[in-house]
């Protein structure tokens, strides 16, 4: 009888240990996943920083965008010019009237001119102003991985990763 009681205690401890292990692993997994709200927070912060005329473009590049470590000077100049182009567009708008939409929320008509090329659509968000799209961004690891002005005409917009 003493042996069966000891065996039950061991089984109970084992079950309890497995339960705690499941809770801990679920918590760790949940921390790694970004929620749609996290993406919007990242995008809003990026837009606010673009809208700030006192913040240098190279600071935005280094702090808000994901780039490769081997970004040559020509590519960096091109990227800075691209940020400035979006920046001018954003600064001309009342940022309180901007909308932040996921790829799914944007609708098929508006997203048909975006070529995802294997990008997870859950990472793609749009900035919209008064029924017009301003730009689209890919968000990864709490930073902007890529952005593009929304295409007008017959050409598809592509995301470029630097």
Label each PLM-derived region with a short phrase.
Residues 30-79:
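N-terminal export/targeting and maturation segments
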Residues 105-162:
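Exposed beta-sheet edge and beta->alpha loop/turn motif
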């Amino acid at each position: 009888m003493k042996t069966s009681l000891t065996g039950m205690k061991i089984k109970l401890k084992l079950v309890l240990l497995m339960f705690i292990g499941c809770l801990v692993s679920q918590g760790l997994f949940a921390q790694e996943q970004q929620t749609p709200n996290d993406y919007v927070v990242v995008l809003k912060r990026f837009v606010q920083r673009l809208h700030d005329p006192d913040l240098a473009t190279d600071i935005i590049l280094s702090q808000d965008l994901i780039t490769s470590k081997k970004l040559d000077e020509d590519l960096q100049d091109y990227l800075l010019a691209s940020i400035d182009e979006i920046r001018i567009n954003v600064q001309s708008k009342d940022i309180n009237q901007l909308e932040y939409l996921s790829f799914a929320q944007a609708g098929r008509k508006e997203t048909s001119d975006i070529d995802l090329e294997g990008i997870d659509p859950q990472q793609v968000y749009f900035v919209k102003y008064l029924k017009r799209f301003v730009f689209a961004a890919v968000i990864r690891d709490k930073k902007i991985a890529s952005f593009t002005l929304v295409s007008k005409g017959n050409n598809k917009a592509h995301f470029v990763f630097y």
